[in-house]
Amino acid sequence: MRTLMSATKNNVYSVSQLNSEVRHILEGQIGKIWLNGEISNFSAPSSGHWYLTLKDAHSQVRCAMFKGRNQSVRFKPVNGQQVLIKGAISVYEPRGDYQLLLESMLPAGDGLLAQEFEALKLKLAAEGLFALETKRPIPTNIQRIGVITSATGAALRDILHVLARRDPSIEVVVYPTQVQGATASQLICQAIVTANQRMEVDVLLLTRGGGSLEDLWCFNSEHLAHAIYNSALPVVSAVGHEIDTTISDYVADVRAPTPSAGAELLSKDKGNKAEKLALLLSRLQQGMKHYQLQQYGRLTQLSHQLQRHEPQHKLQQFEQRFDEIQMRLENALQHKLSRLTLRHQQLHNRLQQRSPVNTLTLEKQRLGYLIERFNDASKDYFKQAESRVSQAAHNLDTVSPLATLSRGYSITSTNEHVIENANQLSNGDVIHTRLKQGSVTSTVTDVSTK
């Protein structure tokens, strides 16, 4: 295979060859990693695959989690959520983007514990604590069982109930201890040591009921693992529910999925051989787990080599490309729909503006406005006219003869001619005098021009 440093003018990479070569380098040299960060740009198209961006305060990386993997995730990721993910570095060749192909995803709190759990499991496996050849056989004729658990917990009640039903002759010695909290692991170790010092039981049943990963964390202690491994008494681990797995399950001689199952495993049911089969199955499970753990590293290495020639990578590339095109198409359709909706609204508004009803309404409003202006103008006009008439009347009254009469003057006339000068009269003429109130008819008896 060519290396990137070998390219010359006569040996030039194509873009596709470059992206393929970079993918092989990243997948071969880095492989799978754990990564902690915040989810953003999460999308879950109809194909069932998940696409997201994992970021911190300074950087981000794209991630893809295909349907076969994300079905095991116990929560629905949301933007802004802190998570711990495990994935393999790869390159999405069509775009030349490097990305993580995710295998698992946990909430940040559980994720850190799970990462610590995996690290401790690998360490103890390397030390040989899980080796099948170190497992102690469980006695076939058990007379007395030592139960290490809480004296007030439901697990002890379940165990006593099962033993009373299946084999009441079995005695139970309880080594009470805390099974949750910061000091629980140390107290459980002390209970195992005490039981080994007394040697009064045939087998130890280490147990408690179900709970969260934090609740069961005391059973993932390295000190507890060594205490179980160093015990002279056989130890059966029956912690939590069937889906829960602890370090004590790997180190113990036999693992039972529940406290009740542990009691059934260690008791006989009127000659029923089912418990023997269950014991063998449990031992087989332990052996398989150990074998799987031993082969994990080799399988991982072979997996990386196989991926270079496996069509699954191409299929994932095609699926991711399909999802990318589908999301782009959906976004384009949504954009087109938004534009059509906006255009429809604009046309609707224009139609409303030109509607006869709206036009009539606007004309009515305009007519009302004109009528109001006409009324106001009419009022102003008549008011001004009234003022002018009043002023004219005043002016007329000022020059009116009647106004003169009202000030004590009179008008004298003869034969309908106003007498302005005494020379116009002679003795014996009949004259008419107009007063403010009424008139007087007189006969001239004397005329004076002075």
UniProtKB/Swiss-Prot annotation:
Q: Which UniProt keywords apply?
A: Cytoplasm, Exonuclease, Hydrolase, Nuclease
A family per Pfam: tRNA_anti_2
Q: Which GO terms describe its biological process?
A: DNA catabolic process
- Mind telling me which NCBIfam families this protein's record contains? xseA (TIGR00237)
A single GO CC term for this protein reads: exodeoxyribonuclease VII complex
The name under which this protein is listed is Exodeoxyribonuclease 7 large subunit
> Where is the protein localized?
Cytoplasm
Report the protein's function.
Bidirectionally degrades single-stranded DNA into large acid-insoluble oligonucleotides, which are then degraded further into small acid-soluble oligonucleotides.
Can you state the subunit structure given in the record? Heterooligomer composed of large and small subunits.
Q: Tell me its EC number(s), please.
A: 3.1.11.6
The UniProt catalytic activity note for this protein reads: Exonucleolytic cleavage in either 5'- to 3'- or 3'- to 5'-direction to yield nucleoside 5'-phosphates
At the top level, the lineage of the source is Bacteria
What is the predominant subcellular site recorded for this chain? cytoplasm
